[in-house]
Amino acid sequence: MIRAAIVGGTGYTGVELLRLLANHPNVEIVAITSRTEAGRPVSKLFPNLRGYLDICFTEPEPAQLAAECDVVFFATPHGVAMDMVPALLAQNTRVIDLSADFRLADPTIWEQWYGRPHAAPHLLAEAVYGLPEINREAIRQARLIACPGCYPTAVQLGFLPLLEHQLVDPSRLIADAKSGASGAGRKAALGTLLCEAGENFKAYSVSGHRHLPEIIQGLQWASRSSVDLTFVPHLIPMIRGIHATLYAQLEHEVDLQELYEQRYAPEPFVDVLPPGSHPETRSVRGNNMCRLAIHRPSAGNTVIVLSVTDNLIKGASGQAIQNMNLMFGQEETRGLMHIAVIP
């Protein structure tokens, strides 16, 4: 059994980790931490876990976690993991971080976007970016995984085949992305109150979203060249799900459907839909799948890729478990083969 702990278990990604790990046949959850809820039974805060998980929240103590666990997940705000991870790695405990602390390779860029110096810059080169569709073999050997963000997952999976084969102009990429309100986290915020977000639709962070440098970094790795991306996120009045509409300009003739089908044929969690399809967010609600559809309107040079994911599963907790499976020699799909919930 893989002995696992979750640091930061009161947010949406934390409870999704709990839900998925509680049903994983090869995982024992030994600790779930929260400074504010220490001593409280987890099922009191999340009644859906009653009967599945008999455990109380505890204070996060790195030494104790290292002694008890094979792997520690961080489902915390940025700035928390980088203070605790060095002590865990020193005791040979592997780490999967769902925050942004280790996603960016350049500590200067991290400081620019997150407003504070990085506390563990020496670990940035070691951290493996946890997108299995590009880093599967490195993930298997990793001590430290930087789990991708929700928008970066949907956008990168949509653009990757085009950029890997250098088929489009990398200076003219557009990502028009929409997310449900759970992407903003569980904290109380005016903009995600029902009366504010319900029956409303708006763009935000148009001048620069924190996921932008992460997306650009990944696309540049894929294209092996500089990339210029216009990224506009939107908040839509639903709880969970991401829909990204991606635009690129073709520079070389190619059978787009065949390109995508061949690229993702071996991937258990990327589904390339038939020509003319329009993926829906409800088709991935509660599961670890990314569904893609490729369009070329009027047979012109503009390629449009539609990408949908569940921001809490493939965009966070499910992908984290996918990484864990690879790290510990499990079947990659173990504990993740859930059918999406409709309606």
Curated annotation (Swiss-Prot):
Which PROSITE patterns would you find in this protein's record?
ARGC
* The enzyme's E.C. designation: 1.2.1.38
Protein's pathway: Amino-acid biosynthesis; L-arginine biosynthesis; N(2)-acetyl-L-ornithine from L-glutamate: step 3/4
- Reading the lineage from the top rank, the first entry is Bacteria
GO BP annotation list: L-arginine biosynthetic process
The UniProt similarity line reads: Belongs to the NAGSA dehydrogenase family. Type 1 subfamily.
Xref: PANTHER family: N-ACETYL-GAMMA-GLUTAMYL-PHOSPHATE REDUCTASE, CHLOROPLASTIC-RELATED, N-ACETYL-GAMMA-GLUTAMYL-PHOSPHATE REDUCTASE, CHLOROPLASTIC-RELATED-RELATED
Protein name, UniProt field: N-acetyl-gamma-glutamyl-phosphate reductase
